[in-house]
Amino acid sequence: MPAPKTIYFSQIAAGAWNDWVRVINISNQRAKVLAIARNHVAQTVWSAEHNLNPFEAWHPPVQGQADRRGDASLEIRSDQPIVGERHCHSGTQVLDFPGASLETRTVANRLFFPELYSGAYDWLRVFNVSEMEALISIVARDVNGRIVRQLQGRAIS
């Protein structure tokens, strides 16, 4: 499977959570990397560029920059293959998320989540990575497959 040249992070959290993102050029060529943060209506609120040598890492300054006006989504593009992760923490809670991409099959038209637990206040954030408007349908089922809740909405690119 080829490594991606574009990766996505659905949320860079403003407020109490502290975020950092690391991007690594995994090719043998110098890479030109562009990070773009967008608000909830897909308007660009911040961007930064960086050149990376082979296997060099970059930490785009998302904390206090990309999230200055609130939560943002992040797209990272490169002319060479890249991998990346988002690390965030609040007090002693630490979360890590790999960058989503078409190549790693973490961006798709259909996603399945094995469990939602109401006591944990689970929530989903959908990020449209297409140039077209998307119709989003969410169907929650119980353990017997019966529909418990259905939601539908549109997401612009």
Segments and roles (model prediction):
Residues M1-S157:
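Gly/Pro-rich, tryptophan- and cysteine-flecked surface segments typical
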